[in-house]
């Protein structure tokens, strides 16, 4: 399996982020072609930490090619273009093969 991970910084308006993300962005992301599953969470630090992400999203695909095709699809482009609507500070995106 192959994972696309998105890490979001703490927004200025947390309530707007959470509402928009749950009601608008996640339903879009769930339409990515080839998506096997996706999950998101609002993590908490264990002990003192200043660099804990506000939100983490993971999307699972069968392969790197499936992920690439999803991200280059019309829906993938729509999902990417939606990010500034709830996360004006952007996001960090990375991917990996699960072992």
Model-assigned labels for residue ranges:
Residues 1-99:
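Macromolecular interaction modules
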